[in-house]
Amino acid sequence: MNLKKLLQKGILPLATLLVAGTLSVSCSKDNEAFRPTPEARPAEPKVPPVKKSIGAATHKIVVNTEKGPGEKVKLLIYARETERSDVFIDWNNNGTYDEDTDDLVTKFERDYTKGASYTEYELKGRDFAVCGKVIRFAIMDEKIKGVDLSGNTLVKALALAGTKTLTLTGLDLSRQTDLRELLLQSVVLPSLNVSQNTALERLVISKTPLTNINLNNNVKLKSLLLNSNKFTSLDVSKNVALEVFACAGNQLTSLDVTKNVALQQFACTRNKIRTLDVTKNTELVLLYVGVNSLTTLDISKNTKVKDFDAGSNQLTSLDFSRLTQLEEVQVTDNRLTALDFRSNPNMKLVACSLNRISSAAYTQLINGLKVNTEGLILVFSEAANEQNEISDAQVTKLRSEKKWKVFKQKADGTIMQTTVGNQ
């Protein structure tokens, strides 16, 4: 059985748009009435072929790499259809288009979350510029040293991702005041300032060494994914428009989400949080708080929750009676003595191994479950610290009467189906 995890990549899918841009050169014929007669026509000098003319670039993004000529870099470039004819890669970064050396951009993609959206370009130097009115730009490469956006204030979406680790000395976004989306993944940089990016709606930062970030000015944020960093504290009190918030895998000891009343999905797993108030988050559909240090959790106001994970805490009780839309519960490795699902008719997944559920309490749990041929339940572990007690007869009832598939976890962590209990 594969227990689901929330937003492992810290990114949500976006629509993809692929439009090929074309360039053409047209030549007009001379008016026949004004042509001299053959006898009077002077010899015409040889004129070199007309080249595509693009004026000096008024907008550009300058990239500095550790790679050399002949090596390749993956870029995603997007401009509005009416602006595409002047978008090119300036390989010598001189600000003008040279048909002999520079590349016109003919592939425009929006979705930086898909590897197939990126185009591989062959470098002709270490520094190059992406010129034109580009509004979405992304790089997938670990050998980028710097990205200078000061020459393009139109950028609305920026994504920088290293296939391993991308190290930058800094990233200045102060002029990108209309930036709506920012993704930094596997990027090492000393700090990040997004205080000028007040239009931000989506911010994804993952696998970085960042320890703090100021989000007070980013009041339009709707999606905030900050998984797998080094944050020791986060203040989201001003981000009242948030609908999706994930901060798994950091070093948080406390977190206040009482002002984030619009939240629909929230995950703070793999931190060190001791107390958490989610009573104001009444719109939550997904709530993941596993692998923390919680001893109590009031979920009585989270009546819309369908997917709940509080595994690996120190919880002694949980009341699901008001969560009538609940479908999936993962509460392994706690100190729970009982679970009651009589008020939860839509249950289809329960993982409750490594608790202290007695045989009598298991009877109550089983009786509360509705018949479900797609139901999956993890009832005990073979680990030495397992204190759940479930009999062969109870497993049989789960399988035969309730039609659930019953699983156990072996000492090595492997999960497999079982037809017998541990008592």
Which residue stretches match the model-derived regions?
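Canonical leucine-rich repeat
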Residues: 147, 168-171, 192, 213, ...
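Composition-driven detection of intrinsically disordered, low-complexity segments
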Residues: 9, 13-14, 235, 256, ...
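Concave beta-strand-loop units of leucine-rich repeat
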Residues: 138-143, 159-167, 183-189, 199-209, ...
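Sec-dependent bacterial lipoprotein signal peptides
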Residues: 1-25
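N-terminal capping/linker segments that flank leucine-rich repeat
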Residues: 27-166, 172-177, 196-198, 219, ...
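A short catalytic or substrate-binding loop motif that flags glycine-/basic-rich loops and adjacent residues
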Residues: 10, 81, 182
